[in-house]
Swiss-Prot record:
Swiss-Prot/TrEMBL keywords: Cytoplasm, Methyltransferase, rRNA processing, S-adenosyl-L-methionine, Transferase
Annotated family: Belongs to the methyltransferase superfamily. RsmH family.
Gene3D superfamilies: Putative methyltransferase TM0872, insert domain (1.10.150.170), Vaccinia Virus protein VP39 (3.40.50.150)
Group of enzyme by EC: transferase
A Pfam family annotated for this UniProt entry: Methyltransf_5
Subcellular localization, as worded in the UniProt entry: Cytoplasm
Listed name of the protein: Ribosomal RNA small subunit methyltransferase H
Protein backbone atom coordinates (compact mmCIF):
# COMPACT_ATOMS: atom_id res chain seq x y z
CA UNK A 1 0.00 0.00 0.00
CA UNK A 2 1.25 3.47 -0.87
CA UNK A 3 1.19 5.99 1.98
CA UNK A 4 1.54 9.62 0.92
CA UNK A 5 4.43 11.26 2.77
CA UNK A 6 3.86 14.56 4.60
CA UNK A 7 0.24 14.43 3.46
CA UNK A 8 -1.31 17.11 5.66
CA UNK A 9 1.83 19.23 5.74
CA UNK A 10 2.15 19.35 1.95
CA UNK A 11 -1.48 20.24 1.30
CA UNK A 12 -1.46 22.80 4.13
CA UNK A 13 1.64 24.36 2.55
CA UNK A 14 -0.26 24.90 -0.72
CA UNK A 15 -2.45 27.40 1.18
CA UNK A 16 -5.50 26.17 -0.76
CA UNK A 17 -7.94 28.76 -2.07
CA UNK A 18 -11.31 27.05 -2.42
CA UNK A 19 -11.89 28.20 -5.99
CA UNK A 20 -8.28 27.90 -7.11
CA UNK A 21 -6.57 25.79 -9.76
CA UNK A 22 -3.98 23.30 -8.50
CA UNK A 23 -1.54 20.80 -9.96
CA UNK A 24 -0.44 17.50 -8.45
CA UNK A 25 2.64 16.78 -10.54
CA UNK A 26 2.98 13.21 -9.27
CA UNK A 27 -0.39 11.54 -8.68
CA UNK A 28 1.04 8.24 -7.42
CA UNK A 29 -1.98 6.63 -5.80
CA UNK A 30 -3.81 9.86 -5.14
CA UNK A 31 -3.33 10.61 -1.46
CA UNK A 32 -2.39 14.26 -1.98
CA UNK A 33 -4.89 14.71 -4.83
CA UNK A 34 -7.83 13.49 -2.78
CA UNK A 35 -6.98 15.79 0.12
CA UNK A 36 -6.60 18.77 -2.24
CA UNK A 37 -10.00 18.01 -3.79
CA UNK A 38 -11.58 17.88 -0.33
CA UNK A 39 -10.49 21.48 0.23
CA UNK A 40 -11.79 22.89 -3.05
CA UNK A 41 -15.29 24.16 -3.67
CA UNK A 42 -17.31 23.51 -6.83
CA UNK A 43 -15.38 26.10 -8.82
CA UNK A 44 -11.93 24.72 -7.95
CA UNK A 45 -9.85 22.55 -10.28
CA UNK A 46 -7.13 19.95 -9.85
CA UNK A 47 -4.99 18.59 -12.66
CA UNK A 48 -2.85 15.55 -11.82
CA UNK A 49 0.11 14.25 -13.82
CA UNK A 50 1.85 10.89 -13.76
CA UNK A 51 3.86 9.01 -16.35
CA UNK A 52 3.02 5.64 -14.80
CA UNK A 53 0.08 4.15 -16.76
CA UNK A 54 -1.07 2.25 -13.65
CA UNK A 55 -1.26 5.48 -11.66
CA UNK A 56 -3.26 7.22 -14.38
CA UNK A 57 -5.63 4.26 -14.63
CA UNK A 58 -6.29 4.60 -10.90
CA UNK A 59 -6.62 8.39 -11.18
CA UNK A 60 -9.30 8.08 -13.84
CA UNK A 61 -11.47 6.18 -11.37
CA UNK A 62 -12.03 9.52 -9.61
CA UNK A 63 -15.35 10.69 -11.00
CA UNK A 64 -15.20 14.38 -10.18
CA UNK A 65 -15.77 17.16 -12.72
CA UNK A 66 -13.19 19.30 -10.90
CA UNK A 67 -10.44 16.73 -11.57
CA UNK A 68 -8.43 15.81 -14.67
CA UNK A 69 -5.66 13.21 -14.95
CA UNK A 70 -2.92 13.57 -17.58
CA UNK A 71 -0.63 10.71 -18.62
CA UNK A 72 2.60 12.67 -18.80
CA UNK A 73 5.72 13.46 -16.87
CA UNK A 74 5.51 16.70 -14.93
CA UNK A 75 8.18 17.94 -17.33
CA UNK A 76 5.37 18.31 -19.89
CA UNK A 77 3.23 20.29 -17.48
CA UNK A 78 3.35 23.69 -19.18
CA UNK A 79 2.38 22.39 -22.63
CA UNK A 80 -0.31 20.08 -21.26
CA UNK A 81 -1.93 22.84 -19.21
CA UNK A 82 -1.86 25.20 -22.19
CA UNK A 83 -3.70 22.57 -24.23
CA UNK A 84 -6.36 22.47 -21.50
CA UNK A 85 -6.74 26.25 -21.70
CA UNK A 86 -5.00 26.81 -18.36
CA UNK A 87 -2.35 29.55 -18.32
CA UNK A 88 -1.95 30.12 -14.58
CA UNK A 89 -2.43 28.03 -11.44
CA UNK A 90 -2.56 28.73 -7.71
CA UNK A 91 -0.36 25.93 -6.47
CA UNK A 92 1.83 23.05 -7.62
CA UNK A 93 2.86 19.97 -5.63
CA UNK A 94 5.73 17.72 -6.71
CA UNK A 95 6.16 14.53 -4.67
CA UNK A 96 9.32 13.12 -6.20
CA UNK A 97 10.70 9.60 -6.31
CA UNK A 98 9.14 6.15 -6.54
CA UNK A 99 5.85 5.13 -4.95
CA UNK A 100 5.68 2.23 -2.49
CA UNK A 101 3.50 0.33 -4.95
CA UNK A 102 6.15 0.63 -7.66
CA UNK A 103 8.80 -0.59 -5.21
CA UNK A 104 6.72 -3.45 -3.86
CA UNK A 105 5.36 -4.81 -7.15
CA UNK A 106 8.06 -7.20 -8.32
CA UNK A 107 6.83 -6.95 -11.91
CA UNK A 108 7.81 -3.26 -12.07
CA UNK A 109 11.47 -4.13 -11.64
CA UNK A 110 12.39 -1.49 -9.04
CA UNK A 111 12.78 -3.79 -6.04
CA UNK A 112 16.01 -5.30 -4.78
CA UNK A 113 14.02 -7.36 -2.25
CA UNK A 114 11.48 -9.06 -4.56
CA UNK A 115 12.52 -10.89 -7.71
CA UNK A 116 11.12 -9.65 -10.98
CA UNK A 117 12.13 -8.57 -14.48
CA UNK A 118 14.80 -5.86 -14.40
CA UNK A 119 12.66 -3.02 -15.74
CA UNK A 120 12.73 0.20 -13.63
CA UNK A 121 10.79 2.34 -16.10
CA UNK A 122 8.35 4.80 -14.52
CA UNK A 123 6.45 4.76 -17.81
CA UNK A 124 6.29 1.08 -18.71
CA UNK A 125 4.85 1.91 -22.13
CA UNK A 126 8.04 3.40 -23.56
CA UNK A 127 11.82 3.42 -23.43
CA UNK A 128 14.47 0.81 -22.64
CA UNK A 129 14.26 -1.43 -19.60
CA UNK A 130 17.17 -1.52 -17.16
CA UNK A 131 18.06 -4.99 -18.46
CA UNK A 132 18.21 -3.71 -22.04
CA UNK A 133 20.28 -0.71 -21.02
CA UNK A 134 22.79 -2.88 -19.14
CA UNK A 135 23.51 -4.85 -22.32
CA UNK A 136 24.79 -1.63 -23.93
CA UNK A 137 26.39 0.24 -21.01
CA UNK A 138 30.17 0.32 -20.78
CA UNK A 139 32.01 -0.13 -17.50
CA UNK A 140 33.05 3.53 -17.57
CA UNK A 141 29.48 4.70 -18.11
CA UNK A 142 28.18 2.43 -15.36
CA UNK A 143 30.81 3.65 -12.91
CA UNK A 144 30.00 7.29 -13.62
CA UNK A 145 26.24 6.79 -13.27
CA UNK A 146 26.48 4.77 -10.06
CA UNK A 147 28.92 7.27 -8.55
CA UNK A 148 26.99 10.39 -9.66
CA UNK A 149 23.38 9.33 -9.14
CA UNK A 150 23.90 6.81 -6.34
CA UNK A 151 26.73 8.57 -4.52
CA UNK A 152 28.11 5.06 -4.09
CA UNK A 153 31.67 4.81 -2.78
CA UNK A 154 32.23 1.42 -4.44
CA UNK A 155 30.99 2.52 -7.88
CA UNK A 156 34.09 1.32 -9.72
CA UNK A 157 34.09 -2.14 -8.19
CA UNK A 158 30.32 -2.53 -8.66
CA UNK A 159 30.52 -1.48 -12.32
CA UNK A 160 33.33 -3.95 -12.93
CA UNK A 161 31.37 -6.79 -11.31
CA UNK A 162 28.22 -5.99 -13.29
CA UNK A 163 30.08 -5.95 -16.62
CA UNK A 164 31.85 -9.22 -15.77
CA UNK A 165 28.59 -10.96 -14.84
CA UNK A 166 26.81 -9.45 -17.83
CA UNK A 167 29.43 -11.01 -20.14
CA UNK A 168 28.86 -14.38 -18.49
CA UNK A 169 25.07 -14.21 -18.68
CA UNK A 170 22.80 -11.20 -19.31
CA UNK A 171 21.37 -9.77 -16.09
CA UNK A 172 17.61 -9.87 -16.49
CA UNK A 173 16.18 -9.99 -12.96
CA UNK A 174 16.24 -7.62 -10.00
CA UNK A 175 17.51 -10.12 -7.44
CA UNK A 176 20.44 -11.16 -9.61
CA UNK A 177 21.56 -7.56 -9.95
CA UNK A 178 21.01 -6.99 -6.22
CA UNK A 179 23.10 -10.06 -5.35
CA UNK A 180 25.97 -8.94 -7.61
CA UNK A 181 26.04 -5.50 -6.01
CA UNK A 182 25.61 -6.79 -2.45
CA UNK A 183 28.52 -9.20 -2.89
CA UNK A 184 30.84 -6.33 -3.82
CA UNK A 185 29.72 -4.09 -0.97
CA UNK A 186 29.95 -6.85 1.65
CA UNK A 187 33.37 -7.91 0.37
CA UNK A 188 34.54 -4.38 1.09
CA UNK A 189 33.44 -4.84 4.68
CA UNK A 190 30.81 -2.11 4.58
CA UNK A 191 27.64 -2.81 6.53
CA UNK A 192 24.64 -0.59 7.22
CA UNK A 193 21.71 -2.45 8.73
CA UNK A 194 19.38 0.45 7.85
CA UNK A 195 20.04 0.20 4.11
CA UNK A 196 20.25 -2.70 1.66
CA UNK A 197 23.70 -2.83 -0.01
CA UNK A 198 22.13 -2.45 -3.47
CA UNK A 199 20.04 0.62 -2.59
CA UNK A 200 22.36 3.22 -4.07
CA UNK A 201 23.06 1.30 -7.28
CA UNK A 202 19.37 0.67 -7.93
CA UNK A 203 18.66 4.35 -7.25
CA UNK A 204 21.37 5.41 -9.69
CA UNK A 205 20.18 3.19 -12.54
CA UNK A 206 16.56 4.24 -11.96
CA UNK A 207 17.41 7.95 -11.95
CA UNK A 208 19.44 7.61 -15.15
CA UNK A 209 16.90 5.45 -16.95
CA UNK A 210 13.99 7.79 -16.17
CA UNK A 211 15.99 11.03 -16.52
CA UNK A 212 14.63 12.09 -13.15
CA UNK A 213 17.05 14.92 -12.39
CA UNK A 214 16.89 16.33 -15.92
CA UNK A 215 13.09 16.33 -15.77
CA UNK A 216 13.10 18.01 -12.36
CA UNK A 217 15.46 20.73 -13.62
CA UNK A 218 13.19 21.28 -16.65
CA UNK A 219 10.05 21.42 -14.52
CA UNK A 220 10.96 23.91 -11.80
CA UNK A 221 11.16 26.95 -14.15
CA UNK A 222 7.81 25.92 -15.67
CA UNK A 223 6.28 25.95 -12.19
CA UNK A 224 7.41 29.52 -11.56
CA UNK A 225 6.04 30.62 -14.93
CA UNK A 226 2.68 28.96 -14.27
CA UNK A 227 2.07 30.23 -10.74
CA UNK A 228 -0.17 33.18 -10.02
CA UNK A 229 1.15 35.80 -7.62
CA UNK A 230 0.83 34.28 -4.16
CA UNK A 231 0.72 30.74 -5.57
CA UNK A 232 2.78 28.09 -3.81
CA UNK A 233 5.32 25.56 -5.07
CA UNK A 234 5.69 22.58 -2.72
CA UNK A 235 8.37 19.96 -3.43
CA UNK A 236 9.00 16.75 -1.50
CA UNK A 237 12.32 15.09 -2.34
CA UNK A 238 13.74 11.79 -1.14
CA UNK A 239 17.48 12.00 -1.70
CA UNK A 240 20.17 14.64 -1.58
CA UNK A 241 20.54 14.97 -5.36
CA UNK A 242 16.90 16.03 -5.78
CA UNK A 243 16.95 18.24 -2.71
CA UNK A 244 20.09 20.08 -3.84
CA UNK A 245 18.45 20.92 -7.17
CA UNK A 246 15.28 22.18 -5.47
CA UNK A 247 17.16 24.14 -2.80
CA UNK A 248 19.50 25.78 -5.31
CA UNK A 249 16.66 26.65 -7.69
CA UNK A 250 14.54 28.24 -4.97
CA UNK A 251 17.47 30.25 -3.65
CA UNK A 252 18.34 31.47 -7.15
CA UNK A 253 14.73 32.56 -7.68
CA UNK A 254 14.83 34.61 -4.47
CA UNK A 255 17.82 36.54 -5.84
CA UNK A 256 19.35 36.74 -2.38
CA UNK A 257 22.73 35.32 -3.35
CA UNK A 258 23.70 37.85 -6.03
CA UNK A 259 24.00 41.12 -4.07
CA UNK A 260 26.64 41.89 -1.43
CA UNK A 261 25.23 42.00 2.07
CA UNK A 262 24.51 45.24 3.95
CA UNK A 263 24.04 47.36 0.82
CA UNK A 264 21.89 50.45 1.60
CA UNK A 265 19.11 49.68 -0.91
CA UNK A 266 15.40 49.27 -0.47
CA UNK A 267 13.82 45.79 -0.53
CA UNK A 268 11.93 46.45 -3.76
CA UNK A 269 15.13 47.65 -5.47
CA UNK A 270 16.94 44.50 -4.38
CA UNK A 271 14.13 42.36 -5.71
CA UNK A 272 14.06 44.07 -9.09
CA UNK A 273 17.85 43.98 -9.40
CA UNK A 274 17.88 40.23 -8.86
CA UNK A 275 14.68 39.43 -10.77
CA UNK A 276 13.30 37.87 -7.61
CA UNK A 277 10.35 35.64 -8.43
CA UNK A 278 9.93 33.54 -5.29
CA UNK A 279 10.14 33.87 -1.56
CA UNK A 280 10.92 30.82 0.54
CA UNK A 281 8.24 29.92 3.07
CA UNK A 282 9.68 28.66 6.35
CA UNK A 283 12.42 26.09 6.76
CA UNK A 284 12.62 22.67 5.18
CA UNK A 285 10.25 20.17 6.79
CA UNK A 286 10.94 16.53 7.59
CA UNK A 287 8.48 13.85 8.69
CA UNK A 288 8.02 13.48 12.43
CA UNK A 289 9.01 10.38 14.37
CA UNK A 290 5.43 9.05 14.37
CA UNK A 291 5.21 9.22 10.58
CA UNK A 292 8.61 7.56 10.13
CA UNK A 293 7.59 4.78 12.54
CA UNK A 294 4.40 4.19 10.56
CA UNK A 295 6.13 4.54 7.17
CA UNK A 296 9.93 3.98 7.32
CA UNK A 297 10.29 5.05 3.67
CA UNK A 298 9.39 8.58 4.79
CA UNK A 299 12.61 8.94 6.78
CA UNK A 300 14.59 10.57 3.97
CA UNK A 301 11.85 12.97 2.82
CA UNK A 302 12.47 16.73 2.78
CA UNK A 303 9.79 19.28 1.88
CA UNK A 304 10.55 22.80 0.67
CA UNK A 305 7.98 25.52 -0.01
CA UNK A 306 8.18 28.78 -1.99
CA UNK A 307 5.64 31.44 -2.96
CA UNK A 308 5.40 33.35 -6.23
CA UNK A 309 5.98 37.09 -5.87
CA UNK A 310 4.47 39.89 -7.89
CA UNK A 311 6.86 40.88 -10.67
CA UNK A 312 7.50 44.57 -11.26
CA UNK A 313 8.80 46.22 -14.38
CA UNK A 314 9.83 49.43 -12.74
CA UNK A 315 10.75 50.83 -9.35
CA UNK A 316 8.33 53.44 -8.06
CA UNK A 317 10.06 56.42 -6.46
Amino acid sequence: MHISVLLEEAVDALNIQKGGIYVDGTYGRGGHSRLILSRLDKSGQLIAFDKDPAAISEARSILDERFQAVHSSYAGMYTALQSLGINRVDGILLDLGVSSIQLDEASRGFSFRHDGPLDMRMDSSRGKTAAEWLTMASETELKEIIRTYGEERYAGQIASAIVMEQARQPISTTLRLAEIVAAVVRKRGHRDDRQHPATRTFQAIRIHLNQELEELSMTLPQCVELLNTGGRLVVISFHSLEDRIVKRFMRMQTGTDTLPRRLPIREEESRLHNQQKLRIIGKKIRPGSDEVSANPRARSAVMRVAEKLETRNAISR
